[in-house]
Amino acid sequence: MRADMSSAQDWDESFDFVIVGSGGASMCAALAAKALGKRALIIEKLAKVGGSTGYSGGVWWIPDNPVMKRAGVEDSYERARQYLDSVATYHGPGSSDARRETYLRTGPKMVEFLERYGMAFQYADGWSDYYDEKPGGQPRGRSLVAPLFDINELGEWKNRLSMYPGVHLPMGSQDFPTLFLAKRTWAGKLMALRLAGRMLRAKLTGKDLRE
């Protein structure tokens, strides 16, 4: 009976895909649907969009990605798989061989797809794999971050984003390790000076730079 009532219902809108949640994966899914000529609807229970992605550090670990290759860093599926298997020894349902292969094979394709539709990435050079001494580890890293962006350009959407509360510094995640050594290294001191200059310019120009 419920099925009969549902089929007779007149709807105001019709969509090919209904996506629950508004995090990074949901946004990618909606973009993929749009690229296929389909209509997608993202539904979010909270007042702000972004989900837990908005509270994350914003670092993507994508081995063998095109951005690192453009930076002159070579990688391969085989090397990345060797590293992943050496550090992630648990092989339960959430970390099966099939999931590992899918993640490593399709990750670079996802980056290419997002770049094609306007997403900007920056190679976090020096953000090494956590266990880069393990087989297949990459000392220069396989991580991607977003370049700094003035979120004032988003207009009213600026206040609709879920973001980690507190002070937001105009710097990328890959710069924090260097900044933390400001009292011990010249590179850290230089990073601190750059940050101060960037904060001053942002203040004078009214920009709100975020990663």
Language model features by range: what are they?
Residues F17-I42:
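N-terminal Rossmann-like FAD-binding beta1-loop-alpha1 element of flavoenzymes
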